[in-house]
Amino acid sequence: LSSEAIEAIYLEIFAVSRNLELPQKVAFLGPVGTYTHQAAESRFGAMSSYMPISSIEGVFRELNNGEAKYGVVPIENNTEGAVGITLDCLRKYENVKIVAEIYMDIHHSFVSLNENLSDIKKIYSHPQGYNQCHKFLDDHNLNSIEFIPTKSTAQAAYLASQDPSSAAICSKIAAHINKVPIMFEKI
């Protein structure tokens, strides 16, 4: 087994044993299928109860009100740096503390119901995901296609699943949840 597989097994065993005591309510920046959702599941395992929340501050409110025991929000990424709203919420909600960090490699996929790149008329994605993939877009002459910003890459995948003339930049899991074929991985 690879070291990644061993680590994944260890984390799942750890999460299951912790949840045998009491299933955890975990709030995360949603919707389902976001990278934050993936991070939450990798840390807390299959036995926890997950609550997708539409904003970072909303996750903090759930924690502050006792509706969730843990929250998962982005705090930093390699391309855009610190996530300002998360830092602001850490100052505002003084009783909410960081108890663990989750390091996660982000790998975007380019997905579409359409098999022909030349037939794609618009690309959905969160602005951050779109900006992170500028080299891919340039290399495939896609940077002139209309970009439609979304609240999350998971929402982008959903919208692409409804329109064959569109594509999305999203996570692999968001593509699978929304049944949108992956044209390119790790873009």
Residue ranges and their predicted role:
Residues L1-I187:
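Domain-level signature for soluble enzymes in the chorismate/prephenate branch of the shikimate pathway
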